[in-house]
Amino acid sequence: MDSWLKRAARLLTSISFGSDGSASVVPYYPQKVRVYGEEKKYFRRTIPEHFGISSKRLFNMLSELEGERRANIHNLFVLAGGEVICECSRDGYGTNIWHLSHSMSKTVTGMAIGMLVDDGRLKVTDRLVNIFPEVPYKDKRFADITVRHLLSMQTGVPFAEAGSVTEVGWTEAFFSSSLKFAPGESFSYNSMNSYILSKIVTRLTGMTLSAFLDERLFSPLGITNYFWEIGPEGVEKGGWGLFLSPESWAKIGYMFLSGGVFEDRRILSEEWIEESSTRWATSPMSTGDFNYAYQMWVGRESEEILFNGMLGQNVWICPKNNIVVVVNCGNNELFQMSPALDIIRKYLGCDIEDALSHSDIRTLHEREAHFFDSRRWVRPLEKKRGLLYFLHLRSRESFDIRWSDILGEYVLAKNNAGILPLFVTGMQNNLDTVIERISLSRAGESLVFSFTESGVDYSLEVGLYEYKSTVLDFRGEKYAVSVMGEALTDRDGVGEYRIEFLFPEMPNTRMIKIKPDAAGRITVTLSEVPNDKIVDLLIKKVPNQNGVAGFVLDMLERRFGEGFIQKKLEEIFSPTIVGADVTHPDAEKIMEEELRRVEDESGVVRLIRSVVARFFKESVGISEARATEQTSSEADGKSSDKRGFFSSILGKIKKRR
């Protein structure tokens, strides 16, 4: 088994069951070191009726999107004929604020390759080993990998996304991989293919990918606010990590729809537009209604083009209707299997022959202004009205006295939680987090939330009438955050206090729910969106991608019962932490009781960790190929010994439970 797979298993175990030291398996370094600046508006705003599309159609589309519970939309931006006919953002976000694109980044990297091909500096038939002759490789078939194989996800290289947080030498790990299949033989989506494309741009131009694209794409399109995270080798990640605003993405999509031209300036050749949007690989039906081209998706049975990133980031191009749609979401979804995208395609990808009525225009504008308000997790208070408030003789935003019952300082029990969502800290390798204390205080008419995380003190205002924005620095990474709180009472009359942390640059949101009792104890539940459901989708793919890891998951389910993995995921992504009011006489007793409970669980945790650690030791000598290619009879024979090992260890765990 490749060493990066073993480290990935160790990392997953540390996240799932805790660790004795740092959860990270490679050194941490800050990657997101900037926050957004607003992009200027470029496109003309108009009414959809100018293009034969009714406002009623768009109103119905927005209503259906808001009613689809699986859709968690942040921004929506619709172009028709190069003009904006619909634009809306959920409260706290904005179409001119950059947003993490995830795998939509790949499309821009692919365009950079196209520019090199247009320049005559590169051919898609060039072999990778000739571009990087100094890097050794093990598998003889690796010599056959071409630029086209990288573009179309047909390299057969298994070193993939998980390796980004287990290795620092990404290029060496990529080249030293044993291929899953001969290059060009099959389709296997892998973001590291895109990273190597990024390295090719740097190798051939002597420039960073960002600098090259600033000259050839961003500046010509008037895109001034962008950011691309850098990998451990000093090169842009290529396949992910690009931050662009919806309006900027709309420019790129419209340029592509216009045959590679923007404002009469050619950005990409017609030949590259045609070649890069041609199907080069047939993707599994499980990925959706699109096949794969060059770092983008193309309709199986239509001319639609899709730039897609996980969690619901999409640029959808419909040549038939001359439409470009940009949508940012925080959805539990991989690839382009998206209920939100399905709704957009339903309304805007069909033959449109609308009856037009200007009476619908105002209704659409009101819908845009209050988009997704019905889906709020916290609801703002209404600002006070009246002459005295209008004249500013009284504050329109007075303090909500319901928060008075929770004001104070609280120490929290041992945990591995952080204000940043786990999905973000995992991707950024920023895993060494612990919230040690929290406090809530009143400052005039404002509510202030303070917390200590990993020894660093933070303090920010919680909006009660609207989101309050600031920037938080977590170990050198900078995140814009908008915060709002709401005081509620549950069915039993017990106070429940919610604080929502929106990260307008990210698909991810952190929610905190605090519930006190009369004995000085509080419970703090941290949840996030997207949540464990997205990881559950990934885990379901594990048995097909890694036979050994699949066996481990199967044995845990066998011993602890069906649903064990899902329950553990829920605990990881939505932990509940016990805390105590530092001024309460029983505070020390509360924390001692919680410490004993944690210690009782730690023995079980250590045994589970030892199971996985021992299973992945090199001495076991089980290769990926042997685990996945053996016949069913061989599998039965081999697995009996493994089950004996698991039975001896997991039997002890079951007794201790």
Where are these regions (language model features)?
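Active-site-proximal alpha-helical segments within enzyme catalytic domains
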Residues: 193-200, 238-261, 313-330
